[in-house]
A protein has these predicted regions:
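Edge strands and adjacent loops of beta-rich recognition modules
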Residues: 288-293, 297-307
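Ligand-binding loop in jelly-roll beta-barrel domains
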Residues: 99, 107-112, 121, 142-145, ...
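Transition-metal
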Residues: 1-156, 216-277, 285-287, 307, ...
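Short beta-strand/loop turn elements enriched in aromatics
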Residues: 139-161, 296-299, 314-327
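Short acidic-glycine-tyrosine-enriched beta hairpin
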Residues: 174-186, 341-368
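Loop-centered beta-sheet repeat module
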Residues: 165-214
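Short beta-strand segments in beta-sandwich/barrel cores
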Residues: 317-318, 334-340
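His/acidic/aromatic-lined binding-pocket segments of jelly-roll/cupin-type domains
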Residues: 104, 113, 135-138, 176-177, ...
Length: 439
């Protein structure tokens, strides 16, 4: 009998960061195995500053490995080479080819995350031969006093941002959000952002780790903690307008707030005011999901991906054909079972079960016809992510913004930047399969 593709889990990979903590190990129960130069494996302890858990990544060196089943030991890139559109769906494969289009992480932001920004697909492709980086943060937990900085609290200029980053006063113009469990933030390319104070995040993004670091809270002045900054490279890709409040969702939404924020996908305009300055609407809406009684709230629907929050109170019958894409589920609370209708060699039908618990991620290949989602705990919450082929480039970049600032010596920068990208010994760029900056 021909073996069929099945829901896939991958071995998580830890990434130590100066702003990381212990929540990925202590709260989510992650077990990170690391190998030394001799191939000896050890368990990474909770005493390490682990900032990221890479759950699903097709990033060259960072290539996720299947954890279970008959495909165990194969990487996601090997699966893409072998199964092509059976993994991601025909339309997605037609656009992205053998590159798996999304990157899934958990973040433990225990200290100040650098003030940073990501490019869009157009800039990333033209300058660095990479995908851009649109992303959504889903807040799984937040300590009292935790902060997210997203965009600016007023319109500013490139010159003001440049000066403030150099002077260490940029915090004064950053828009501050005090996150709570269940909140969601869509970080569009060009949005300057940072965070601090104990935040556990599920992050869904394009398959790119390209980050421009603008300010590092003083770490850059200490030789022991200094990391490269990319302010010059990023100055013309930043959205300098005041933060668009429609990109942040307080969760859960109830009553008047939910009604105010609801928006129909097919409508050209909504009541939230997000179109007043010509920005695209990313408002959140409730929708029926499949044929069950559950409700999926769409957190973001953008050209690159669509992410919904699914409060799983009853079993749901999911048909993958509806999405035309693979489906990724991230369990942020409780536990669930993916039950796949299967047939034994003797022709008898049965359900094959695949469990997903809090802090786990599963990839459902597009080739699977249908399956059931069954909650195992009373309060089970899943994030559901599917991919949309990109049809239009991001439009936030103002073509009139000067790429260079007065009084600064940029001689040779434009010509030298392309050369720098290919020489890691003379540049802050780090290579992980594609040319990119590292956060």
């Amino acid at each position: 009998m021909e073996k069929k593709l099945y829901p896939l889990k991958f071995i998580p990979v830890a990434s130590e960061r100066p702003w990381g903590g212990s929540a990925l190990v202590k709260t989510l129960g992650k077990r990170f195995i690391v190998s030394d130069e001799d191939g000896n494996e050890t368990l990474l302890g909770a005493d390490k500053k682990i900032g990221e858990s890479w759950e699903l990544a097709d990033m060259g060196v960072e290539d996720s490995v299947v954890a279970e089943g008959w495909l165990a030991g194969n990487t996601i890139s090997e699966l893409m080479e072998t199964y092509l559109e059976n993994i991601v769906g025909e339309d997605v494969y037609h656009y992205y080819g053998r590159q798996f289009p999304l990157l899934i992480k958990f973040l433990d932001i225990n200290d100040r995350l650098s003030v940073q920004v990501h490019p869009d697909d157009e800039v990333a492709a033209e300058r660095y031969d990479s995908l851009g980086k649109a992303e959504i943060w889903y807040i799984m937990d937040a300590q009292p006093g935790a902060r997210i900085y997203a965009g600016f609290n007023r319109d500013i200029t490139a010159q003001e941002l440049y000066d403030r980053c150099r002077q260490g006063t940029v915090e004064e113009v950053l828009n501050v959000i005090y996150p709570k469990k269940g909140d969601a933030l869509f970080i569009t390319p060009g949005t300057v952002h940072a965070a601090d104070g104990g935040i556990l995040v599920a992050e869904i993004q394009e398959s790119s780790d390209m980050t421009f670091r603008l300010y590092d809270w003083g770490r850059e002045f200490n030789p022991a903690t200094a990391r490269p900054l990319h302010l010059d490279e990023a100055i013309d890709i930043i959205d300098y307008r005041a933060f668009d409040a429609g990109l942040f969702r307080k969760g859960p939404l109830w009553g008047e707030e939910a009604s105010h924020r609801a928006c129909h996908a097919e409508a050209e305009h909504c009541d939230c005011g997000c179109h007043e300055d010509g920005r695209e609407c990313h408002c959140h809406k409730h929708q029926s999901h499949s044929d069950g009684n559950g409700i999926a709230e769409t957190l973001v629907e953008c050209p690159e991906f669509c992410v919904s929050e699914l409060n799983l109170s009853d079993s749901l019958h999911i048909y993958t054909e509806k999405f035309g894409s693979f489906i990724i589920y991230i369990c942020t609370e409780g536990a669930a079972s993916l039950q796949v209708p299967s047939t034994q060699e003797d022709g008898k039908a049965y359900m094959q079960n695949y469990e997903i618990s809090k802090g786990e991620t599963v990839l459902v290949p597009a080739d699977m016809d249908d399956f059931f989602l069954v909650p195992r705990d009373r309060e089970t919450v899943l994030l559901e992510a599917v991919c949309r082929p990109v049809e239009e480039m991001d439009g936030y970049i103002d073509p009139d913004t000067e790429a260079y600032l007065e009084g600064e010596d940029y001689e040779g920068l434009e010509d030298g930047l392309a050369d720098d990208v290919s020489d890691s010994s003379e540049t802050p760029l780090t290579f992980f399969g594609q040319n990119r900056f590292r956060s």
